[in-house]
UniProtKB/Swiss-Prot annotation:
It comes from Treponema denticola (strain ATCC 35405 / DSM 14222 / CIP 103919 / JCM 8153 / KCTC 15104). This is Cyclic di-GMP binding protein TDE_0214. Residues 146-234 form the PilZ domain. Keywords: c-di-GMP. Residues 288-314 are annotated as: Disordered. It comes from the Bacteria. Disruption phenotype: Mutants are less motile, reverse more frequently than the wild-type cells, and form less biofilm. Invasiveness and ability to induce skin abscesses and host humoral immune responses are significantly attenuated. Cyclic-di-GMP binding protein that plays important roles in motility, chemotaxis, biofilm formation and virulence.
Length: 314
């Protein structure tokens, strides 16, 4: 088991080591990152800072121009230790570690901002396994969500356990009205659900589909639109309803849960590969870093209670 884990970490590192992850509000939440416990240490002192972005080989931090840390750097100090900190939502011990790094450059944080600077550091040794694992899982899920966006995962009891889906039965809000439904299959871009109803009255409707996952526990909704209906064989009272998510409303957590299936699944035979083919999910040449796909200005969507109209989802 330890050998398999080591192989996976090496795979993450070799594939994704140079891809920057911007620590947007959503990424911070997804990784259980603890910004208040982050600081940089050098020359016998330590100062709080903000992680702007990080990869498995470097990090960019934000600090004030009047910071004593910046003065140390300008005095010729180039070696530092950056503290990363993560908390556990299920009450386990928190995780923190230092990463040794050297100064690469200092620049203005953003045009017009006279108070903050952006400082780039390069790690002087391979990143800790915990950082490689956390960034690797997130990056693989984000890449798979683009490369495999339309591949459907039929929800069986075994698949539900694997991806952490609490149950197939859930609630879908159709034009703000809650309806009970069953999840038949999922993809990174949508879902197919079964519910009682008349097809003509369910097409082209605004919906929010509610999900509950374990490991870690999370409840959220994804906003989308019904795009197609299909009859259910032997059940005239039921309709199969295809939901297409709005891309900007797909939480990173959803991608990570669903990717638990794709992270070890063999490619289907229909793609021209045998059952023993295990695909390495390498970033495509056109892949945009996580800095862009994960929105920095959208708050996670919280599903509305059943007795109220739904509201909307870094």
């Amino acid at each position: 088991m330890a050998f398999a884990a080591s192989q996976q970490l090496n795979r993450y590192y070799n594939l994704y080591k140079n891809i920057d992850v911007t620590f947007s509000k959503e990424v911070v939440s997804t990784l259980n990152f603890e910004p208040k416990q982050v600081f940089v240490r050098c020359s016998g002192g330590q100062w709080p800072c903000i992680i702007n972005s990080a990869s498995m080989t470097k990090a960019k931090i934000i600090c004030g121009k009047k910071s004593g840390f910046l003065a140390r750097l300008r005095s010729g100090i180039t070696s530092v230790n950056i503290r990363f900190a993560f908390f556990d939502t299920e009450g386990k011990d928190s995780l923190s570690f230092f990463v040794a790094a050297k100064l690469v450059g200092i620049s203005s944080y953003e045009a017009g901002n006279q108070d903050l600077v952006l400082i780039t550091f390069e790690y002087t040794q391979r990143a800790p396994d915990d950082l490689i694992e956390k960034l690797g899982i997130l990056l693989e899920a984000n890449i798979n969500s683009q490369k495999r966006r339309n591949e459907r995962v039929v929800i069986t009891p075994e698949i539900s356990r694997k991806i952490g889906l609490v149950e197939k039965g859930t609630v879908v809000y159709i034009d703000a009205v809650p309806r009970r439904c069953l999840i038949r299959d999922l993809s990174f871009s949508g879902a197919k659900i079964l519910l009682v109803g008349i097809a003509n009255f369910l097409i082209n409707k605004e919906v929010i589909l509610r999900f509950a996952f374990d490991d870690p526990q999370s409840v959220f909704g994804i906003k989308g639109k019904t795009v197609r209906t299909e009859p259910v064989e032997g059940r005239k009272d039921l309709v199969a309803l295809a939901v297409q998510y709005y891309p900007k409303n797909i939480p990173m957590m959803y991608k990570m849960y669903l990717n638990k299936y794709f992270s070890v699944v063999r490619k289907p035979a229909s793609d021209g590969f045998g059952d023993d083919f295990l695909e390495d999910v390498a970033p495509a040449s056109s892949f945009t870093p996580v800095s862009s796909p994960i929105g920095t200005n959208t708050a996670p969507l919280t599903p509305p209670p059943a007795d109220s109209a739904p509201e909307q989802i870094s």
